[in-house]
């Protein structure tokens, strides 16, 4: 082989080796880039379902040292998994209740444009809590606020704000309603909104901002619902609705709703004689409600809802320290767990309680005759023992010299347990305060705590003489 051939051969071999090295480096670069972008890649949805967004773990015996100078690395943010709520965690063990929120709506109305409201309640989604109320279609310092003591007018709408934000002029009007309930199923809000003629009202079911279903009055006598949050478990929401006499036999039905569509209706069964304005809470796998008997009992009805087979049972809270107003004094009040006590049963007020093993936590007005003051306490054996009256852990929420009103429960899911909270409606204006022509409210909110707590009173606090007439 002559020198020129040697040179050509060596050059060809070198070029081949260089080409192979280049291809290997290109393959390594492509592999590295692909692995980098796939490390935080979201899995492709299967069957239109949202899949978990997890990093891919790559195991290899290669140590890579990367030197970065003035380099910004942006990590892809994957969307959170949206799931239905199931409320399967246990109930938090508490020692009492601690202050959480107060909106001061009436005090602020003395110098600002705040809605006239009543029938407030609170409900939460995964991230925030919201306050709701039924507006009267007017602000307080407005001639339209005259005679707003009336419950049912076509101008009433359901208002919704973040908890602690008073209902100002920019407040969202969710729907037309003079009776309502709202709850979040984990994916979207459901609002049950009732409006129309007393003898032929309509309940609209609004889910994720859209009207999905409706139902008309079935007894032609003021179709009405809870005035507090409904409850959703695994995509099915349930709400208690009543149509019929407020002081006699009425027709109560429990509706089951999936993404705004009514999927089943169950009649009330069990021993409860009259049920309205229920305060419901998740008690996995079912739902439990504490209601108002406006006919026969000052002891509160209990409605147990089976979310799997749609069956219903009902009874009464066993505690002999009864929760409704008006009621007998504590020495003479009674409850046998099964039947209304026939003690000042006519009339009443929305309220709440919840079971804690054999015991019961409850709230009620301090006055046995009027919607004045508010207290909470635990009754030992109050859930299981007829006429139990051993009271512990009493707290004053509103002192007896100040007005209260409706109250209700809402549930908040924590990391390890489900906490129970409650709100108290602080009514002001007519009938008791005849200097003004309007009737409205503010709210105060407390939540269960496992810690210690002090004492106090949290009334509405507005000086009626400072208020617009």
From Swiss-Prot:
Stretches in topological domain Intravirion: 1-6
Transmembrane segments: 7-29
EC number: 3.2.1.18
Matches recorded under InterPro entries: Glyco_hydro_34, Sialidase_Influenza_A/B, Sialidase_sf
Binding site for Ca(2+): 293, 297, 324
Keyword set includes Coiled coil: no
Function in brief: Catalyzes the removal of terminal sialic acid residues from viral and cellular glycoconjugates. Cleaves off the terminal sialic acids on the glycosylated HA during virus budding to facilitate virus release. Additionally helps virus spread through the circulation by further removing sialic acids from the cell surface. These cleavages prevent self-aggregation and ensure the efficient spread of the progeny virus from cell to cell. Otherwise, infection would be limited to one round of replication.
Protein name: Neuraminidase
Organism placement in taxonomy: Viruses, Riboviria, Orthornavirae, Negarnaviricota, Polyploviricotina
């Amino acid at each position: 082989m002559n020198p020129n051939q040697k040179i050509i051969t060596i050059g060809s071999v070198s070029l081949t080796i260089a080409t192979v090295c280049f291809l290997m480096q290109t393959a390594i670069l492509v592999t590295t880039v692909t692995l980098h972008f796939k490390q935080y890649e979201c899995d492709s949805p299967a069957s239109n379902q949202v899949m978990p967004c997890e990093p891919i773990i790559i195991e290899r015996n290669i140590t890579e040292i990367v030197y970065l100078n003035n380099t910004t690395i942006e990590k892809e943010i994957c969307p959170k998994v949206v799931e239905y709520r199931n409320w399967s965690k246990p109930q938090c063990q508490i020692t009492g209740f601690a202050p959480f929120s107060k909106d001061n709506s009436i005090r602020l109305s003395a110098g600002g444009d705040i809605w006239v409201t009543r029938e407030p309640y609170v409900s939460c989604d995964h991230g925030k809590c919201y306050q709701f109320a039924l507006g009267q279609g007017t602000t307080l310092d407005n001639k339209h606020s005259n005679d707003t003591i009336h419950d049912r007018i076509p101008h009433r709408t359901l208002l919704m704000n973040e908890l602690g934000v008073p209902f100002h002029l920019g407040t969202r009007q969710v729907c037309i309603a003079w009776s309502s309930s709202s709850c979040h199923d984990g994916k979207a809000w459901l609002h049950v909104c009732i409006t129309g003629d007393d003898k032929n009202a309509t309940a609209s079911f609004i889910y994720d901002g859209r009207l999905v279903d409706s139902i008309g009055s079935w007894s032609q006598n003021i179709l009405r619902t809870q005035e507090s949050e409904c409850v959703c478990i695994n995509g099915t929401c349930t709400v208690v609705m009543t149509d019929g006499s407020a002081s006699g036999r009425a027709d109560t039905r429990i509706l089951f709703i999936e993404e705004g569509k009514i999927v089943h209706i169950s009649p009330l069964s069990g021993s409860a004689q009259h049920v309205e304005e229920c305060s419901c809470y998740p008690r996995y796998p079912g739902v439990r409600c504490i209601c108002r008997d406006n006919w026969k009992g000052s002891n509160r009805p209990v409605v147990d809802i089976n979310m799997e087979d749609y069956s219903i049972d009902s009874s009464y809270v066993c505690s002999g320290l009864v929760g409704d107003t008006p009621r007998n004094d504590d020495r003479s009040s009674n409850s046998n767990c099964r039947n209304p006590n026939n003690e000042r049963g006519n009339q009443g007020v929305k309220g709440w309680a919840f079971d804690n093993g054999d015991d019961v936590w409850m709230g009620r007005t301090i006055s046995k005759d009027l919607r004045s003051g508010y207290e909470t306490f635990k009754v030992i054996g109050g859930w299981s023992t007829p006429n139990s009256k051993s009271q512990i852990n009493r707290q004053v929420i509103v002192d007896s010299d100040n007005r209260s009103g409706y109250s209700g429960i809402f549930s908040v899911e924590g990391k390890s347990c489900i906490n129970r909270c409650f709100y108290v409606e602080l009514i002001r204006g007519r009938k008791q305060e005849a200097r003004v022509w309007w009737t409205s409210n503010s709210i105060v909110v407390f939540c269960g705590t496992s810690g210690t707590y002090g004492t106090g009173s949290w009334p509405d606090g507005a000086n009626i003489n400072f208020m617009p007439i």
